[in-house]
Amino acid sequence: MDKKRKKRGKSRFFLLAIIIIGALFFAGNIAKKHFNDLAIFKIKHIQIKGNRLIDTSYLYEMAAPFIGTCIFDVDTQDIEMRYFAHSRIKDVTVQKSFPAKIIVSVNERRGVFFVRDQSGDFHPIDEDRYVLDKADWYIDEDLPLVNIDIHRGQIAVGQKLEDSRLDHIYDVFYQMIELDKRLITDISEFFYRDNQLNFIDIKSGCRIILTSLNLDKQVERFIFLRDNQGFKKNSTIDLRFDGQVVVL
């Protein structure tokens, strides 16, 4: 008899537990529906942060379809995926700010160079060699030009540009600006002539010929002479010879 009573007691306990769980689940659904219907939790505001060149209204419109949606029903990853499709966005974080606001923080890909293709068109690329899109709001983007005689078919927005000459220019450029930050804005163009890397200095209009050997010493000599002695406008400055500067 005691065993039968114990079994019936366990059965009642499990039945009661199931009823309680079902009641909680039902109550949760009712509460969720109630919250979803409350206007206070409908998304009303979208805040955009971190953009420098990409137009704020453009970024706002990418998240605008979620206006009026209950904030509890929004998956932030769904919003983030809309932004990752843009070539200029390197990273994005979407946060909920209760009761009715979402905050979109973007990290832009910023152009380092314009690459000129064989047809003469310019394409911005970032520090990772990714080709960026062009739009009217990037009109103030002022970047050094890279002329490596590349075919238009090799360039696609959102894709990484692979070219050994371009890799060499990146290496040289970053070494140069470590020596003098002014060179970020002082260089107007990089190009190859007779398999030698050249660049044009904006201040003097001079063409400077470089070699990879002892690049730091070449750049230091050029900067010192330019700032203290100056060069005749549009001269050619050959830095390939150790300890010498040849002016043509």
Predicted segments with their positions:
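Extracytoplasmic beta-rich repeat domains
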Residues: 53-55
